[in-house]
């Protein structure tokens, strides 16, 4: 069996399908995906309700239940890795309001409603498309 770094498929999917500004919400202290996407030329912003020191990644403290709209404006993608289930609807609302696609990589066993399951190169995550460049997957 070949060892794969965690989130390799997710990083590759985002790299192939998005450009420009992307925002990771509920980032916590795990920045592997954000750092790799920044290396690939993305304008990455990490957001969390708690102030966190980040390793060379732009970080903005924000409460996604009452978000500051300017943080998310013009993002092509809003994504979150293992956010609390009760925040899914708020993440989705931010993405829809900003016409950005939304990806959630949930904890094992959690399934976001109104999202499509993706299996990309062995990584499983859920997507909902809102961007002007893509048709909506689900209403």
Task: Name the predicted role of every residue range.
Residues 29-42:
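Conserved SAM-binding loop of SAM-dependent methyltransferases across substrates and taxa
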Residues 69-77:
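A short acidic, Gly/Pro-enriched loop at the edge of an enzyme's catalytic core
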Residues 43-49:
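Conserved SAM-binding motif I beta-strand of class I
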Residues 49, 83, 107:
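Short beta->alpha hinge that forms the Motif I/post-I loop of the SAM-binding pocket
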Residues 56-69:
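Conserved SAM-binding strand-loop segment of SAM-dependent methyltransferases
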Residues 86-139:
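C-terminal substrate-binding/active-site "lid" region of AdoMet-derived donor-dependent transferases
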Residues 1-20, 138-139:
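S-adenosyl-L-methionine
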Residues 19-29:
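Conserved class I S-adenosyl-L-methionine
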